[in-house]
Regions:
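Charge-dense, helix-prone N-terminal extensions
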Residues: 1-126
Length: 126
């Protein structure tokens, strides 16, 4: 299991509860995604009622909205559309806002490739 040093203790307990009962494959995907984000910079993991937010210390930068049987669904909220990519399965503008949510479905650890790492870095610094 990944070390969540920047995540407050009470949120670590919530996270454990959130992850309980998930498949070994899904947990491996989750750990890999978090580990890859930690290579970019320090992050904190914030579980909520229906999703898990990841922050860079200033703001939440991505949201894991679904931990399926064999996948993760991750939303990257950007201020603009990034249409020219192969990693996002859907891009939707938030009504009445400039925010565009970019949806990434992770099925294998290899899905976190150089292209996605570029968008992870944009999210981290944005």
């Amino acid at each position: 299991m990944v070390c969540y040093t920047n995540t407050p203790e009470e949120e670590r307990e919530q996270l454990q509860a959130f992850l309980t009962g998930k498949s070994v494959h899904t947990l491996a995907l989750f750990d890999h995604f978090i580990t890859e984000f930690q290579k970019i910079g320090p992050i904190a993991v914030h579980p909520a009622k229906t999703m898990i937010g990841i922050s860079n210390g200033r703001k939440r930068i991505v949201y894991i909205t679904r931990l399926g049987k064999d996948f993760l669904l991750v939303v990257f909220p950007f201020k603009r559309r990034y249409d020219d990519n192969l990693c996002f399965e859907k891009i939707a503008q938030v009504p009445g806002d400039e925010q565009c949510n970019h949806y990434f479905r992770m099925l294998q650890v290899e899905d976190v490739n150089e292209e996605l790492r570029t968008y992870m870095s944009i999210a981290y610094g944005g």
